[in-house]
């Protein structure tokens, strides 16, 4: 896998996948998504086929993805074949450029399965290493070395993701300290095919925002990455930026009904507007008013910035419907991916991040 400027972590849900399809070709070339395949709610095989067909349609077969099957480990298709194996083999059969993702929690059978997929033609492998906010270099390196030994792969074959998960305000300093220390002493630092740093400060739920209310959340992961890229240790390799777009880390329960909300990414924060739905399925007036305030403010990127921004402007003008939470997830993700891609393009170190030293 070649270097990407940005690696968003996305769930394989309709809103996120449709947002990928709406990206312009220039933005697509700078992004390699890490897709977390969601667990099946019905027939496992049929579910996997739908997901792969959808992904092939919205992202294409020529664009790389990192395929994370962590939510599929206990599922099987007919005949007892693990769903994760079926997924990866199906992607290879469809000639999709999929990179299997391993993590330290995988048992030997899962690791061996991923090794076989790599041998069968997958474009290398990805290690996703979960780390606490106070992780020390030895903590990270032990997990990485153990996975190298278990998989039998060389660092040059591996995209390494250091995943700090959720990071909130009280953890800001500890997080910044940890990433500087871990990256300064990272094992095989110059050998990894790609080095990626991910985290998110987006909340797991929006329950603390009242209906017809609004709030903002700092993009701590972006602030920490950009600070490190500009002023980190000169000897440390600059990782590729990654985040969870406009979502929290955990997968919501299958029966969870998302609140009507607009999540809008700006330079250093997310704005969140939360509305209510009338009995006819349409958002209430207060939600439309908040959207109108955004589109007339200096913080609005403009209708040409992304599919999501065009939709938002059309909704305010009464040209677009706004009743589906899936549509608002697509709006938020579309805007976020395009916004971050532009933000990174304006960062002088972005072009060199994640890559091995010459």
How should these model regions be labeled?
Residues 1-107, 193-194, 204-358:
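Alpha/beta catalytic barrel-like cores
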Residues 84-248:
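Eukaryote-skewed repeat-based solenoidal scaffolds used as protein-protein interaction platforms
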């Amino acid at each position: 896998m070649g270097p990407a400027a940005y690696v968003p972590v996305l769930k394989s849900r309709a809103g996120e996948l449709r947002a990928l399809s709406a990206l312009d070709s220039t933005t697509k070339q700078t992004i390699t998504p890490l897709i977390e395949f969601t667990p099946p709610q019905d027939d496992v095989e049929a579910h996997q086929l739908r997901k792969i067909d959808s992904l092939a349609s919205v992202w294409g077969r020529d664009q790389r993805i990192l395929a994370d099957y962590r939510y599929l480990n206990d599922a099987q298709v007919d005949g007892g074949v693990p769903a994760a194996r079926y997924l990866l083999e199906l992607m290879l059969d469809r000639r999709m450029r999929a990179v299997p993702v391993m993590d330290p929690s995988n048992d030997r059978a899962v690791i061996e399965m991923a090794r076989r997929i790599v041998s069968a033609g997958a474009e290398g492998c990805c290690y996703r290493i979960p780390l606490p906010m106070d992780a020390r270099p030895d903590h990270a390196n032990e997990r990485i070395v153990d996975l190298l030994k278990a998989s039998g792969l060389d660092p040059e074959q591996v995209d390494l993701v250091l995943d700090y998960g959720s990071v909130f305000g009280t953890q800001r300093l500890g997080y910044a300290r940890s990433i500087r220390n871990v990256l300064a002493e990272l094992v095989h630092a110059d050998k990894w095919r790609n080095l990626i740093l991910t985290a998110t400060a987006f909340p797991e739920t929006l329950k603390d925002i009242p209906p017809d209310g609004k709030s903002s959340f700092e993009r701590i992961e972006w602030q920490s990455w950009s600070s490190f890229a500009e002023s980190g240790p000169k000897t440390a390799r600059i990782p590729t930026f990654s985040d969870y777009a406009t979502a929290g880390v955990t997968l919501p329960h299958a029966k969870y009904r998302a609140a009507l909300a607009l999540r809008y990414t700006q330079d250093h924060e997310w704005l969140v507007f939360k509305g209510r739905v009338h009995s006819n399925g349409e958002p209430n007036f207060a939600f439309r008013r908040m959207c109108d305030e955004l589109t007339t403010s200096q913080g609005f990127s403009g209708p040409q910035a992304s599919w999501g921004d065009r939709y938002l402007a059309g909704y305010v003008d009464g040209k677009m419907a706004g009743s589906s939470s899936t549509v608002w997830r697509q709006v938020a993700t579309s805007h976020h991916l395009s916004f971050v891609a532009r933000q990174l393009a304006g960062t002088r170190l972005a072009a060199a991040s994640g890559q091995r030293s010459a």
